[in-house]
């Protein structure tokens, strides 16, 4: 549920997301933007509608319910629900909303078949496990699956999907290529029965750096939102030039001196070694600004980077503004993004947080949000 009780401000640049989509299209023939989990915190409906207007032929969401929400907002292109129809209610909703759910097992296939007819079959995407050991059929199930599908004219397989475990790590390329080979064998078996079925294997990293794994439809996710999935690797150049799409700011509650020798916040984990000035900002772990950033995080105040002092509290955090002249109550401080060269990226914040940019964006994006709609 979105956070509605604070004064944080999340601003999402749709123009940046579209620029990233255009960048991806220079290397991908048919990218299917992944906008699951509220578009990684960027706003499902706004992002989906902007991408459809830009020419996306389909988008991928997480759940059928998320897909129905997008459809209700007026999204007219195809929607693939990556978690599939989990129960009868989901199956009914997928059929009535024209959503393409993944199928993970025979029970799920039969659940969806009950909602279609030979004249109006429910379209499905067949999910295969090629190495994640997470969800879906295996390569050994292909023959029996095709045989069962031939007895169910009320469903129509239009796509087969699998997911890569380490496409972002070139030191494990052998595993990635083994997954690709397994998927190729799966597709050969499927196409001997369903010649028109499309294949979708590549995530952001593979979309950018492994064209041999593209198949018919590519599934960029984190790259759409400006994070380079290949950062820090020998393939990092393939993800350069992506634009961050989210900034998060909060107000200053109070500015006061912190004399040398005085501690601050819970646990007294920080004691000033010299006279300082601190600002208490309206952000804490209840606002999805992690307690893991205690004594580690940075923010942007007055165009300068400043450190977090002491422990992050539930709704407040202390920052050192000794070198930020004129800062006052009510001024905005950026936790993510920010004006000028001092901006904090999602990747950098994730490193300080001890996590990945996906989590940073999904969590901070739950705060009060607005969209910059200036898409060119």
Curated annotation (Swiss-Prot):
Substrate binds at residues 134, 314. It holds the Pfam family Ala_racemase_C. Catalyzes the interconversion of L-alanine and D-alanine. May also act on other amino acids. SUPFAM superfamilies: Alanine racemase C-terminal domain-like, PLP-binding barrel. HAMAP family: Ala_racemase. This is Alanine racemase. It comes from the Bacteria. It catalyses: L-alanine = D-alanine. Its EC number is 5.1.1.1. GO terms for cellular component: cytosol. It comes from Nitratidesulfovibrio vulgaris (strain ATCC 29579 / DSM 644 / CCUG 34227 / NCIMB 8303 / VKM B-1760 / Hildenborough) (Desulfovibrio vulgaris). InterPro entries: Ala_racemase (IPR000821), Ala_racemase/Decarboxylase_C (IPR009006), Ala_racemase_C (IPR011079), Ala_racemase_N (IPR001608), Ala_racemase_pyridoxalP-BS (IPR020622), PLP-binding_barrel (IPR029066). One of its GO terms (biological process) is D-alanine biosynthetic process.
């Amino acid at each position: 549920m979105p956070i509605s009780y604070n004064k944080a401000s999340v601003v999402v640049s749709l123009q940046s997301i579209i620029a990233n989509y255009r960048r991806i299209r220079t290397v991908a023939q048919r990218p299917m933007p992944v906008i699951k989990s509220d578009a990684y915190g960027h706003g499902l409906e706004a992002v989906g509608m902007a991408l459809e207007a830009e020419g996306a032929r389909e988008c991928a969401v997480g759940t059928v319910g998320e897909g129905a929400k997008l459809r209700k907002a007026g999204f007219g292109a195809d929607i693939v629900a990556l978690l599939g129809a989990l129960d009868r209610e989901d199956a009914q909703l997928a059929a009535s909303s024209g959503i393409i759910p993944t199928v993970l097992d025979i029970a799920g296939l039969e659940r969806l078949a009950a909602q279609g007819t030979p004249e109006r079959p429910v379209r499905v995407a067949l999910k295969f496990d090629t190495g994640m050991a997470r969800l879906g059929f295996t390569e050994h199930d292909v023959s029996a699956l095709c045989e069962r599908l031939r007895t169910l004219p009320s469903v129509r397989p239009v796509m087969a999907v699998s997911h890569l475990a380490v496409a972002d790590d070139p030191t494990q390329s052998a595993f990635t290529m083994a997954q690709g080979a397994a998927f190729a064998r799966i597709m050969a078996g499927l196409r001997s029965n369903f010649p028109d079925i499309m294949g979708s294997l590549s995530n952001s990293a593979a979309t950018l750096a492994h064209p041999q794994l593209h198949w018919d439809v590519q599934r960029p996710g984190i790259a759409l939102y400006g994070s380079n999935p290949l950062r820090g690797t020998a393939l990092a150049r393939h993800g350069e030039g992506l634009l961050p799409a989210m900034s998060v700011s909060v107000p200053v509650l109070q500015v006061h001196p912190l004399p040398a020798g005085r501690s601050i916040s819970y646990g007294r984990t920080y004691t000033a070694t010299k006279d300082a000035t601190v600002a208490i900002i309206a952000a804490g772990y209840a606002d999805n600004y992690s307690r893991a950033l205690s004594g580690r995080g940075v923010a942007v105040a007055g165009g300068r980077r400043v450190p977090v002092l002491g422990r992050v509290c539930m709704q407040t955090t202390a920052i050192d503004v000794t070198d930020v002249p004129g800062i006052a109550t009510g001024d905005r401080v950026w936790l993510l993004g920010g004006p000028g060269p001092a901006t904090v990226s999602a990747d950098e914040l994730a490193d300080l947080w001890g996590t990945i940019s996906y989590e940073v964006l999904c969590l901070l994006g739950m705060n009060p949000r607005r969209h910059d709609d200036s898409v060119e």
